[in-house]
């Protein structure tokens, strides 16, 4: 249960950086073996990061469930055993290139980034991009990154979901087998982003190397699953979900 909303000013991009580092090998899974083992079992995997959570998933046949649980437990318990400064530097560069491709070098990328900083006050955990700033990524030390992992990557701060053609009792036994000895982390305070309220209309005009002008409109809306959220999803779909 960690996303960019758990980060602090000056330490942005850590949640997304770990989405990359988690696939780089752990104590009992050599670099590259995570994907190779799953592919050999007919499974696929990926991950994603938002402001509120980081998600890792594996889709595969039910007879590969134990392999999936072993791989997940090993990187939760033993990632730091193999997370060298060189490995962090390598994935840091990958993330910075990803940012260039998705923001700096993409038409309209910067205005989309600026919208969050206009909707949320400076220092609010939703005011920066999930991918982090170039400055923060460059400044992140190996010790900073290790501390982030120790704080958030523990069984008491994670949810495990197993679904599909499984025997529930057998699945629970496998979960117990592979996760029971993974040590709990320290209690993680729940993230409660300070309430944001716009008191006036904010406008910003930007110049970029694009062929056509573009207008962005943004509003602060109720939190997910709160009253009004579903209705606004429908309104957004009606206003911007199609060409007509």
Task: Give the positions of each predicted feature.
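Active/ligand-binding-proximal structured segments within catalytic/core domains
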Residues: 1-34, 227-239
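M16/insulysin-pitrilysin zinc metalloprotease superfamily fold
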Residues: 25-28, 59-91, 240-243
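Bacterial peptidoglycan biogenesis and beta-lactam-recognition machinery
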Residues: 23-27, 79, 168-169, 179-185
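Non-catalytic beta-strand/loop surface segments
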Residues: 3-4, 30-64, 101-157, 181-226, ...
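Non-catalytic, conformational "gating/processing" segments within enzyme and secreted inhibitor domains
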Residues: 85, 92, 143-178
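Solvent-exposed, non-transmembrane alpha-helical starts
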Residues: 9, 66-69, 105, 173, ...
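Non-catalytic accessory/assembly modules
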Residues: 69, 83-116, 166, 173
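Divalent metal-coordination and catalytic microenvironments
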Residues: 16, 56, 72, 95, ...
